[in-house]
Amino acid sequence: MGAVMKLREFSSYAASPAVDAPPSSSQSQMDASTTRLRQGARTFARLSLDQRIVLVNAMQQGFLRVAKRMVQDGCKAKGITLGKPEEAEEWATGPWGVVRQLRLIRESLVALKNSGDTPIGPVGGTIDGRLSVRLFPGNAIDGMLFRKFTAELHMQAGVTVESLRRDRARFYRQPDHDGRVVLVLGAGNIAAIAPMDVITKMFNEGKVVVLKMNPVNAYLGPYIEEAFGEAIRQNFLSVVYGGADEGRYLVYHRDIDEVHITGSDKTHDNIVWGPPGPEREMRMQRHEPLLKKPITSELGNVSPFIVVPGPYSHSELRCQAEDAATSYLMNASFMCCAAKMLVLPKDWVGSDVLIRSLQEICARVPPRQAYYPGAEDRWRKLTTGRAQVKHLGRVEPGSLPWTFISGLDPNAPDEPLFTQESFCPVIADTRVGSADPVEYLERAVDFCNNTLWGTLNANLIVHPQLLKDPRINEAVERAIAKLRYGVIAVNAFIGMPFVLAAPTWGAYPGSTPEDIQSGSGVVHNTSMLEGVEKAVLRAPLTTFPKPGYFASHRRSHKMMPKLVAMEENARWAKVPGIVFDAMRG
């Protein structure tokens, strides 16, 4: 295993989804789309708040109409059996976030109309003197369904209470354009990503959107076209299809003002700097990108799962193993936020207990279809020739086993699992520090910041009893402040901030085009705040009833459609059915 190992770019593999999708768009069709959107851009930028609210309502109702069919096709494409708990994944990673985001955007637009401000919670401070803004729970139903969960944004240095208010919802208060066309290059793994990116660009930033579907899940495009049909009819949105060639044509198109991509850093660099070779190197040295347009991006991560040593009971460690398993197993581990590196304390008995619990949970989950192009190739390159590899589950044709790689040396400079996103069902562990919580946190933060690739997200597990010690409590808060990740989940599933939609989702700020890491810019952010450094979700160490997103929940496929329906208007009448299924999970 050496530094010379390079994993191929995702787009270099042919996509062959199990569900039929529309054919690639021709250049004339793409030209027609961009021309139409160019005509609609100024109109959209000048819409009144009332007109935007009407459009949001139409888009949300449209998405509710297609949700079930969208989930069914997603399950078919990924080899998931309908009517089983695994079906819940497609509800959780598809309609839930989209319907919720549209509700929260509507609430923000109504608040802007009525008060001139978007809704936020209490403003506080962080241990390093920055402002923090509470965003979740946003209402009593949030608080009841996710008891003692909180989400806040930590602002960048220099953001003041005055600038926090002045810069909020900037497009609506201080418009910086009179109509722009943005190209959104959709992700191929998670159904919600493309529509949620579209919603962000349209309603946070006031831009019209050309959405190019990813070939891996292009079968979802017709559902997005149907759901967001009103935006398409008014020339505010167009959906096109194709692979790298079509994407390249649109990226440099004269009618595209800017680009947003969810994908890999390799794809980003090909767009910004051109194909690998001497010419790219020269451009990078001269800081002369091939792409002259603004680009924002979310580009993946080697996601750490950090466990602070403490007085955990067996059931408490088991609950956190469920969190880790959910992050690792969901969507067959084809997620940018999937747990990939267990960063555990040296010389602490709980490290082995956690790994055993995690492996026991994974062993009961049948291996999933490796639907993402290149998965088997990546898996073989990362696992072949290693000594401490454990495969779990009976592998069927087309699937890959849940794979654990143990005992990685944290000081190994050429370990590919530290420096490259695997994007396949591989998880590894490494040990740092000691059983002393403060020493461990210092070492773990240093390792994650300076050894692991990426700046998107991190999990931090800490026992509440430890926080009663002022010294340890301070060390935990300093660790949260120092971790250079855009999203941090404390004692919670890392995918929750994504689907909650109110927090920002994106890389830690400060990347450069030459070293993009996990990307630049943020999406979601339904309160439309500026100057965000990171989103922080905190949860209890254990929760009851069992969260519906846990891989072991027995009725999640019954509960998730009800949760999606509730998110339409956040009505109490729709809560009892959710609670009933949650309690029986």
Predicted features and spans:
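N-terminal Rossmann-like NAD(P)+-binding subdomain of aldehyde/semialdehyde dehydrogenases
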Residues: G2-D167, M213-A218, A227-I232, P576, ...
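Catalytic cores of nucleotide-enabled group-transfer and carboxylate-activating enzymes in metabolic
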Residues: L47, V54, V66, T81, ...
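C-terminal core of ALDH-fold dehydrogenases
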Residues: V54, L441-F550
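PLP-dependent aminotransferase-like
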Residues: V181, I193-D245
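Conserved NAD(P)+-binding/catalytic subdomain of aldehyde/semialdehyde dehydrogenases
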Residues: V181, P215, E230-M341, K346, ...
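Short loop-to-beta-strand entry elements in the cores of soluble alpha/beta enzymes
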Residues: E205-V216, L291-G310, A324, Y328-R356, ...
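NAD(P)-dependent aldehyde/semialdehyde dehydrogenase
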Residues: M330, K346-L456, P470-R471
